[in-house]
């Protein structure tokens, strides 16, 4: 048996450093957090070659007293806490006392520091945990750390670092997170002698978001401000149009610390679920202050936390974010194509160029128009449809949209559903430029006229149906386009989910019943999830052996192959390894609603589309179908006139 021996201090330090210093980004994080704890108002981060060869952190904080400099590099030496009880209430970013010891064990470190009260500063040099110099030096107030040749004495660790460009991008991302966490501190980031980021430190969180993420995101934000018995949260979330395919744009800060939290992420993603496409994630910059005790001593990076009351925090945060999203009208606006027109190439010809045929034809048309008699009123006669449909005032049953496929005349008139205000004649073709945000979701203020309201519906002007799928509606100075399939799918989905929540799902008997033969796995899933299946409105009875009989089906889902849908449901339950049952139910309701909804190319009548709009009005979130596609988009009068070059 090998002898058991105590490791020497150098080996211990290198092993400990491996937990704290994973890459150059870790060095920057630890040193900048120390600078923040020192009360700095300006911090400069400079790196070269991705921070592998050179890192310099400069701050104007309180500095380190001369007799404390060497002690600061001992393991577990800190000014942040004094006992284990302090871990639950610690407010500083650092507290373990391991950072300087770990960094100096695997790099060449130079420290220059001066306190406000001292006349001169201190220069301290340490390499591989060995002190090389400790001397007085002239220096400004604050602290400067210079870290060179990271992992110079641990070649195995250095070998596994990525390229300088990749390591530099990690540092850039970390500096951005630190700048977001403390908008009252001016951050400057220099990479290979080029300034990549410089914030003002004016405390304005939206300014920081603009500096880091740009105008598109900063102009599409919703403010969050909420306080409850568990926490206080402030900051911004992105409108549903701002999404990413990963969680890189989810930023959470707790008591000034950038953290990654599954509880917070899941709560916010649940709130966004009905507003986003599948596998898309929102943009968030949220600042939390928790009133209960927190455990930040979970991971050496201090980026993970534990809460006392996970469930309460989850529910409160999810409800808060959903309320903000649900009470804003966010209809995607079609952007104007900003691609500049190609420049015309002008050729010189010595002989006169013959007048193009197209120009002559246009001139002839204009001449013919000028000879027209405008005094006579021309009325278009519309042939009434011979197909019988429900009258406008006739109440529609819930399944009207599904059971009636009414063919109407090809020439659909413009129908006004209320007392629409006729537009005033234009007195001039000159238009004042308006401020337009293109490619975003327009959030209307409290005093703007909202599209999906009862009062607004009285002023709708339904123009007609386009491609037998989209309904065109004029309101105020915008054209709204409703996707009849997505809208009906959303209505069915919300009705089904409401019935599930209230446990009042009703069924309709079918004759003859559907008889199916299930295999062993399907039988197991049926018995395991029978309560959930019966909640949908199915009535399933054992018919002997592997035979099962469906005698009743959900009463609000029509025109669906119920046998295939039932088998598909059992397959989904079978494939849902490790997933929450409510998530499976939600997805299945969305699938059922999609299949039962009116399809594209289905001709709807005016009463039917009015019924559909009325049902949309009753929803908290009528803007997206269950899969995240928009139900309504809009195009402003300004944008249409821009397309026709009436506005240049």
UniProtKB/Swiss-Prot annotation:
Q: Which InterPro entries match?
A: DNA_mismatch_repair_CS (IPR014762), DNA_mismatch_repair_MutL (IPR020667), DNA_mismatch_S5_2-like (IPR013507), HATPase_C_sf (IPR036890), MutL/Mlh/PMS (IPR002099), MutL/Mlh/Pms-like (IPR038973), MutL_C (IPR014790), MutL_C_dimsub (IPR042120)
Q: What residue spans carry the Polar residues bias annotation?
A: 396-430
User: Which molecular function GO terms apply here?
Assistant: ATP binding; ATP hydrolysis activity; ATP-dependent DNA damage sensor activity; mismatched DNA binding
Renumbered to this chain, region (Disordered) spans 385-430
User: A GO biological process this protein is involved in?
Assistant: mismatch repair
Q: What keyword terms does UniProt attach to this protein?
A: DNA damage, DNA repair
One GO cellular component assignment for this chain's record is: mismatch repair complex
CDD domains in the record: HATPase_MutL-MLH-PMS-like, MutL_Trans
PANTHER family with a match to the protein in the record? DNA MISMATCH REPAIR PROTEIN MLH, PMS, MUTL, DNA MISMATCH REPAIR PROTEIN MLH1
Q: What does this protein do?
A: This protein is involved in the repair of mismatches in DNA. It is required for dam-dependent methyl-directed DNA mismatch repair. May act as a 'molecular matchmaker', a protein that promotes the formation of a stable complex between two or more DNA-binding proteins in an ATP-dependent manner without itself being part of a final effector complex.
Q: Which family does it belong to?
A: Belongs to the DNA mismatch repair MutL/HexB family.
This chain's protein is named DNA mismatch repair protein MutL
């Amino acid at each position: 048996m090998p002898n058991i021996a105590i490791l020497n201090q150098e080996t211990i330090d290198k092993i400990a450093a491996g937990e704290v210093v994973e890459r150059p980004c870790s060095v920057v994080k630890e040193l900048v957090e120390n600078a923040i704890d020192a009360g700095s108002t300006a911090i400069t981060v400079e790196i070269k070659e991705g921070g592998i060869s050179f890192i310099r952190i400069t701050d104007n904080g309180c500095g380190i007293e001369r007799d404390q400099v060497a002690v600061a590099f001992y393991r577990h030496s800190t000014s942040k806490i004094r006992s284990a009880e302090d871990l639950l209430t610690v407010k500083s970013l650092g507290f373990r006392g391991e950072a300087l010891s770990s960094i100096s064990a695997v790099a060449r470190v130079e420290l220059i520091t001066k306190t406000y009260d001292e006349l001169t500063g201190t220069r301290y040099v340490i390499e591989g945990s060995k002190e090389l110099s400790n001397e007085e030096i002239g220096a400004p107030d604050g602290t400067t750390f210079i870290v060179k040749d990271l992992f110079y004495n641990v070649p195995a660790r250095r070998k596994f670092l990525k390229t300088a460009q990749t390591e530099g991008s990690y540092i850039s991302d970390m500096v951005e997170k630190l700048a977001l966490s403390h908008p009252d501190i001016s951050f400057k980031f220099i990479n290979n002698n080029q300034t990549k980021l410089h914030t003002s430190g004016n405390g304005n969180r939206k300014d920081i978001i603009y500096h880091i993420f740009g105008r598109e995101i900063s102009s599409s934000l919703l403010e969050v401000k909420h306080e409850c018995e568990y926490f206080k949260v402030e900051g911004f979330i992105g409108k549903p149009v701002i999404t990413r395919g990963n969680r890189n744009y989810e930023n959470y800060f707790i008591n000034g610390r950038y953290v990654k939290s599954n509880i917070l992420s899941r709560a916010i993603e649940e709130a966004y679920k009905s507003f986003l496409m599948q596998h898309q994630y929102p943009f968030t910059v949220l600042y939390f202050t928790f009133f209960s005790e927190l455990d930040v001593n979970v991971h050496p990076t201090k980026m993970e936390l534990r809460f006392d009351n996970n469930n309460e925090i989850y529910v409160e945060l999810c409800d808060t974010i959903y309320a903000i999203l649900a009470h804003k009208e966010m209809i995607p606006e079609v952007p104007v194509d900003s691609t500049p027109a190609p420049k015309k190439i002008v050729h010189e010809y010595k002989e006169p160029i013959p007048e193009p045929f197209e120009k002559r034809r246009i001139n002839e048309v204009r001449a013919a128009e000028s000879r027209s008699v405008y005094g006579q009123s021309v009325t278009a006669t519309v042939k009434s449809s011979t197909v019988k449909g429900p009258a406008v005032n006739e109440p529609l049953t819930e399944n009207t949209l599904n059971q009636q496929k009414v063919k109407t005349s090809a020439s659909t008139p413009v129908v006004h559903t209320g007392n629409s205000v006729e537009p005033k004649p234009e007195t001039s073709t000159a238009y004042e430029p308006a401020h337009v945000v293109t490619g975003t979701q327009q959030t209307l203020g409290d005093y703007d006229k909202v599209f999906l309201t009862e009062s607004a519906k009285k002023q709708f002007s339904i123009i007609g149906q386009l491609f037998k799928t989209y309904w065109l509606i004029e309101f105020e100075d915008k054209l709204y386009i409703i996707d009849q399939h997505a809208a009906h799918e959303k209505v069915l989905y919300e009705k089904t989910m409401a019935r599930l929540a209230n446990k009042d799902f009703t069924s309709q008997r079918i004759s003859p019943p559907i008889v199916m033969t299930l295999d062993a796995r399907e039988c197991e899933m049926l018995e395991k999830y029978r309560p959930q299946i019966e909640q949908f409105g199915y009535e399933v009875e054992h018919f002997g052996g592997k035979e099962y009989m469906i005698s009743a089906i959900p009463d609000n889902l029509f025109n669906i192959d119920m046998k295939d849908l039932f088998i598909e449901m059992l397959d989904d339950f079978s494939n849902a390894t490790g997933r929450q049952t409510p998530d499976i139910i939600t997805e299945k309701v969305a699938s059922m609603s999609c299949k039962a909804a009116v399809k594209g190319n289905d001709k709807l009548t005016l009463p039917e589309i009015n019924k559909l709009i009325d049902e949309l009005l009753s929803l908290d979130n009528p803007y997206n179908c269950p899969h995240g596609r928009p139900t309504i988009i809009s195009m402003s009068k300004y944008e249409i006139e821009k397309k026709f070059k009436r506005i240049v």
